[in-house]
């Protein structure tokens, strides 16, 4: 059985981890999901690394919702850098799934974006694990997670 890690935060205003888990369960079998929740996005890198090294996860999703302030953007960048370092240290993919609070003005639109992005990245995880040829087929197609695809040039 393949182990997959889901790591999310209490700072987020939407349960993206729950949406990702729901999506994985709908579209894949033979996966054991291990979920960890941390306070904020800067806690994600070590939590994801622990899921890989201590729990044996073959792939991890890191889900977070940085706030709208400049300091939140700095924290998001630091978290992203940490996630990249964790990937390189463990030779394991960590799918970064961030939705910035200022991506949408309306809270309902932000909720829809967070749900869609979490679910579409969960589908990416499934494809990376079980159908990598699908991703190759879609290379250069302008695919977007959470918002409409923009298409190829």
From Swiss-Prot:
Inhibition and activation profile: Inhibited by EDTA.
EC number: 2.5.1.9
Entry protein name: Riboflavin synthase
Similarity comment: Belongs to the DMRL synthase family.
NCBIfam families per record: ribC_arch
Residues spanning the signal sequence: none
Keywords of the record: Magnesium, Riboflavin biosynthesis, Transferase
Keyword Transferase: yes
Keyword Magnesium on entry: yes
Lineage: Archaea, Methanobacteriati, Methanobacteriota, Methanomada group, Methanobacteria
SUPFAM superfamilies noted in UniProt: Lumazine synthase
CDD domains in the cross-refs: Riboflavin_synthase_archaeal (cd09210)
Pathways involved: Cofactor biosynthesis; riboflavin biosynthesis; riboflavin from 2-hydroxy-3-oxobutyl phosphate and 5-amino-6-(D-ribitylamino)uracil: step 2/2
Organism: Methanothermobacter marburgensis (strain ATCC BAA-927 / DSM 2133 / JCM 14651 / NBRC 100331 / OCM 82 / Marburg)
Catalysed reactions listed for this entry: 2 6,7-dimethyl-8-(1-D-ribityl)lumazine + H(+) = 5-amino-6-(D-ribitylamino)uracil + riboflavin
Cofactor: Mg(2+)
BP GO annotations: riboflavin biosynthetic process
GO cellular component, one term: riboflavin synthase complex
């Amino acid at each position: 059985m393949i182990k997959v890690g889901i790591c999310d935060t209490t700072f987020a205003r939407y349960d993206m981890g729950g949406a990702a888990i729901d999506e994985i369960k709908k579209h894949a079998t033979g996966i054991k999901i291990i979920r960890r929740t941390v306070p904020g996005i800067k806690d994600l890198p070590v939590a994801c690394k622990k899921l890989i090294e201590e729990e044996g996860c073959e792939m991890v999703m890191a889900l977070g919702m940085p706030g709208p302030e400049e300091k939140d953007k700095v924290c998001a960048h630091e978290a992203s850098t940490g996630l990249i370092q964790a990937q390189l240290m463990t030779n394991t993919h960590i799918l970064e799934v961030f939705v910035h609070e200022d991506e949408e003005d309306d809270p309902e639109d932000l909720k829809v974006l967070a749900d869609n992005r979490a679910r579409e990245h969960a589908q990416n995880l499934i494809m990376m694990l079980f159908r990598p040829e699908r991703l190759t087929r879609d290379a250069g197609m302008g695919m977007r997670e959470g918002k409409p695809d923009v298409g190829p040039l």
